[in-house]
Amino acid sequence: MASEIIVDHQQKAFELLKLDAEKILKLIRVQMDNLTMPQCPLYEEVLDTQMFGLSREIDFAVRLGLVDENDGKELLDRLERELSALHDAFTGK
């Protein structure tokens, strides 16, 4: 029973982190589509702030034992790759 609760908390924690990563991606898509260019300091500031916040969330979940460190790194890496591809598509690279 206790191990089922732990697994459930781990799954919920990772799902919440994935949702936060998706929110960052959506925010950047909206910003690129409607508001600013990727070279804009505001764009860079928003992206840096959001990515830093997510990395701190992941670190906290890892320290609590809710998320495996490698899974957390993979989540950040995947988001960075998606953001890079989005940036390249927007700038025509």
UniProtKB/Swiss-Prot annotation:
One Pfam family matching this protein: DUF1507
Transmembrane feature ranges: none
Protein family membership: Belongs to the UPF0358 family.
Name this polypeptide is given: UPF0358 protein RBAM_014700
